[in-house]
């Protein structure tokens, strides 16, 4: 077995597929999910190494795994304690498959317990950054520096290892920070190598994927595009598809893919609900209709959506009403333009994760919903939806969609457009949405985007936008007392939107944005800056 991290050949950018397609002879790493918030992030990290990965339930049987024939298995972290009576367990026959296994946090503790070791509540939990001291630098820890920072988040610890296991690394508070049974290719880490805070975490994941599982870097953007087009054609055949085009990278990439797959059987419809940013509806129609000759049906539904939100202040109700009205408009327009059999949506992994995030109840052992917020693409769909869904991007993260978009010729201004929520400015207005408040926020938001664009900093941020609060503050302008709205600036740095940090913006830029908003946007006399990270906050205010 090689002891050097493989240097990958110059391959195209890597991406995942949408489903487990048994017809394809594809190497795969399976992640068994025990309710961790990072399970999909593990999958993303593996895909970045040009190896396909899929997240499955922890209940997946050893027999099913044998049929799937993965090159390796990863047991995710989770919020529970393995010594609880109803703690989630994996099929113990997994250990007899002869497939390499890596347990992460809870996954490592479960491995230890099921194989005869012992796990107890730690005298002192370990949360945040920790220095990893390496005792055995082979296999899993090849090219991981001694003293490297890793991210810990655990209240339990392994106090006795199963027979055949040895300690690979420790930290100040955790004796068994990394363990291994080299003969059986069973490995465990108490930390989270998948998160950005773990400095050499990617090196460790590559070691598992390439050294231990002996995978090859075969998963590419081109492979995803080719397979997705084949899957769309196989599913849709000669049926007609209706696509909700928003102008963002998700729906635009989907439009290009669908147009390549089914041509004129695709109808793109842009429903202008009145919640988009300044100038976006006009620019969208120009790009698709005139520049790329992909016909788009324009529907002006601004008054309908605004009427639905009269008197509504609850953010979840806003999302539900917008989602419901969106589908209602779709159904009405489909009768006029149809018939249509499929509704195409640019749903992504983070949409699915945040709309129905799951946990495992320690009392019952069952997965339960821990709802964060209803996404426009997911939570707002009515139960009587007439369309069948086609969601080719459902397993992709935002950066992966951008890679696909770029590879199929999507304009760079769309590829690198900041993420924008389906309900648009309606959920950046805290409280009731009115025409007046929309105009205030739209103008303030334009100033933010205009200034960071002038400074050449647009692509330095994951998102940069304004939020309008439902309060007023006292000010003085031209020797006159004012009583007007405050605007919140939200500029975010992130890799994937799963976690995010507030951006350390130069004071001069903040000052310029603030001065312009106060002077150019009628009804605003104060600007504040949001310095909350995700978690504990979310990127959007609603």
Swiss-Prot record:
Q: In which pathway does it act?
A: Purine metabolism; GMP biosynthesis; GMP from XMP (L-Gln route): step 1/1
| GO MF terms held by the record | ATP binding; GMP synthase activity
**Catalytic residues identified in the record:** 105 (nucleophile), 192, 194
Any one cellular component term from GO for this entry? cytosol
Q: Where along the chain is ATP bound? A: 246-252
According to UniProt, the reaction catalysed is: XMP + L-glutamine + ATP + H2O = GMP + L-glutamate + AMP + diphosphate + 2 H(+)
Keyword Ubl conjugation on entry: no
Q: What is its EC number?
A: 6.3.5.2
User: Ranges for the GMPS ATP-PPase domain?
Assistant: 219-417
Q: Which NCBIfam families match?
A: guaA_Cterm, guaA_Nterm, PRK00074.1
UniProt protein name: GMP synthase [glutamine-hydrolyzing]
Upper lineage: Bacteria, Bacillati, Cyanobacteriota, Cyanophyceae, Oscillatoriophycideae
Protein encoded by which gene: guaA
